[in-house]
UniProtKB/Swiss-Prot annotation:
Keywords, sorted A to Z: Antibiotic resistance, Cell inner membrane, Cell membrane, Cell shape, Cell wall biogenesis/degradation, Hydrolase, Membrane, Peptidoglycan synthesis, Transmembrane, Transmembrane helix
Listed Pfam families: BacA
Enzyme Commission no: 3.6.1.27
Coiled coil stretches, renumbered: none
Molecular function GO terms recorded: undecaprenyl-diphosphatase activity
Transmembrane domains' residue ranges: 43-63, 85-105, 109-129, 184-204, 218-238, 254-274
Protein name, entry field: Undecaprenyl-diphosphatase
Free-text function comment from the UniProt entry: Catalyzes the dephosphorylation of undecaprenyl diphosphate (UPP). Confers resistance to bacitracin.
Family: Belongs to the UppP family.
GO biological process, one term: peptidoglycan biosynthetic process
Gene (UniProt): uppP
Length: 276
């Protein structure tokens, strides 16, 4: 492993960790940054699976007490059972559509122009959602009904379009469906666990031939870096939303998306030549 490869792994691990749970699209940022770093091909596909696992481990650690309570209470406690059922209900729509459309979406939509467009559109929707009056009926994740869970799960399917953001879709969807800002954010984190682990297992098995022992040092750098920076991002977001809206993230999405589109329009960067 040379120094440049290690630097690529470090940078992409940081990008994954910081963006995975913020409503700004980690996949979109990965596509753009990986293209700028000229990090692509089969190794990149395997690398992305590993760093996503590093990011999800950060959420598991952050909410370990809640997870442990649910696991212990699952056999006897209705609250734990209801929470688990709601999580499964929210998880299923992405599973079904992911299996059907994943390859098609990866082939045609995994490019910086799609990402930039989705960033801008998603940012505008986020601003609109934040300015609407919301009638909140779920103040905690335990107040969520199965209908709420299904709606959030359907909203998560929009994140199959790169640049949309899985967390952005579920959080904003949650706000529109009557969840408090804190509840929508926490449920988005919990929903990320089965969704991302399921996607990683599916992709890991499908592309198992890409994992080579020589790449393990690169994977280790990305995994650890993604874990550390995801921890920072999760803690920071939970603290931020206690007193702020998501408007700042919406404006960031719009500005970043317009910047990418401008560099393409004026010919400064040939994004159309980018490969996933």
């Amino acid at each position: 492993m040379d120094l440049w490869t290690a630097a690529q792994a470090l940078i992409l691990g940081i990008v994954e960790g910081l963006t995975e749970f913020l409503p700004i699209s980690s996949t979109g940022h990965q596509i753009i940054v990986a293209d700028l770093l000229d990090f692509g091909g089969e190794r990149a596909m395997a690398f992305n699976i590993i760093i996503q696992l590093g990011a999800i481990l950060a959420v598991v650690w952050e909410f370990r007490r809640k997870i442990l309570d649910v696991v212990i209470g699952l056999p006897t406690q209705p609250k734990a059972q209801r929470f688990t059922i709601n999580l499964l209900i929210a998880f299923l729509p992405a599973v079904v559509l992911g299996v059907i459309f994943a390859d098609l979406i990866h082939a045609y939509l995994f490019n910086p122009i799609t990402v930039a467009t989705a960033l801008v559109v998603g940012g505008l929707i986020m601003l609109w959602a934040e300015r609407r009056q919301h009638q909140v009926h779920a103040e905690t994740v335990d107040d969520i009904t199965w209908k709420d869970a299904l709606k959030v799960g359907c909203a998560q399917c929009l994140a199959m379009i790169p640049g949309t953001s899985r967390s952005g879709s579920t959080i904003i969807g949650g706000l529109l469906f009557g969840l408090s800002r804190k509840t929508a954010t926490e449920f988005s984190f919990f929903l990320a666990m089965p969704t991302m682990v399921g996607a990683a297992v599916y992709s890991g098995y499908k592309y198992r031939h890409l994992f080579q022992p020589d790449d393990f040092p690169v994977f280790a750098i990305g995994f650890v870096t993604a874990f550390v920076f995801a921890m920072i991002a999760v803690k920071g977001l939970l603290k931020f939303i206690a007193s702020h809206s998501y408007a700042a993230f919406a404006w960031y999405r719009i500005a970043f998306g317009l910047l990418i589109l401008a560099t393409w329009q004026f010919g400064w960067v040939d994004w159309t030549a980018a490969k996933p």
